[in-house]
Amino acid sequence: MNDRDFMRYSRQILLDDIALDGQQKLLDSQVLIIGLGGLGTPAALYLAGAGVGTLVLADDDDVHLSNLQRQILFTTEDIDRPKSQVSHQRLTQLNPDIQLTALQQRLTSEALKDAVARADVVLDCTDNMATRQEINTACVALNTPLITASAAGFGGQLMVLTPPWEQGCYRCLWPDTQDPERNCRTAGVVGPVVGVMGTLQALEAIKLLSGIETPAGELRLFDGKSSQWRSLALRRATGCPVCGGSNADPV
């Protein structure tokens, strides 16, 4: 860590829970962010600002006018430009001292496994169940911590899932790939609610990477109308085909 790094990250280095050792861990880490929408854009901003050494930004979509209500990396001038490229540009302006990789593609199959294998933490910021299940399967197979979130209307949810998956995985809670009837596309979403959830994904990643204990194996539910939180303990599903021990499918 050089003098420039020390000055840039000084406000979090002052924290006893992070300090120089924790900051160096962040600088040495790689985070994969899949999905650069209402969750992924605030998460990416805070992780870049915090000095996570390598960020891999994956999204195959372009910026649309309807995105601008909540996807805070983008401006009106970015409409029809690839989200991953715009994100790379903006985050480079914020922090040119970190490594940024833009993947203008939908990560599936071997490409997904390869990206997950290189990451210390994966942020699932996607918006469909099939992709979430595929990300979860790859993370469990490769023992990579997964931080997943979603939001619709005034509500959000967040989970931190870590090896050895004693509290289960995403598949344990949602055993199929069918999207819920109520989601961002059908029910709408309040911008700050999805921003809260994406920001919390970044916070949990910083805690994991810097060695701060974080509550894993919980489903955390946020009600934006009442500003209240609820936490539900997760349980490993018997015979889960992804993490269910001897009953798991081979990968």
Indicate residue ranges for each PLM-predicted region.
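Adenine nucleotide-associated cytosolic modules
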Residues: 1-251
